[in-house]
Swiss-Prot record:
NCBIfam families: rpmD_bact. One of its GO terms (molecular function) is structural constituent of ribosome. It comes from Acidovorax sp. (strain JS42). Transmembrane segments: none annotated. One of its GO terms (cellular component) is cytosolic large ribosomal subunit. It holds the Pfam family Ribosomal_L30. Belongs to the universal ribosomal protein uL30 family. Keywords: Ribonucleoprotein, Ribosomal protein. It comes from the Bacteria. GO terms for biological process: translation. This is Large ribosomal subunit protein uL30. Coiled coil: none annotated. Part of the 50S ribosomal subunit.
């Protein structure tokens, strides 16, 4: 069994005033408040979501 790689992301900019789909993506990644951090599995789907809202998040 292989261990799944993870990726940590932090919400560094408020999604207020952004597109509704971008706000939904932030929520889909499990980020709520500013500076909240979440650790997710490193999959192509998660990478795509991070790429979509790259101006709102920071990869740690």
């Amino acid at each position: 069994m292989t261990t799944q790689q993870t990726i940590k992301i932090q919400l560094v900019r408020s999604p207020i005033g952004t597109k509704e789909s971008h706000r939904a993506t932030v929520r889909g990644l499990g980020l709520r408040k500013l500076n909240s951090i979440n650790e997710l599995k490193d999959t192509p789907e998660v990478r795509g979501m991070i790429n979509k809202i790259s101006y709102l998040v920071k990869v740690l």
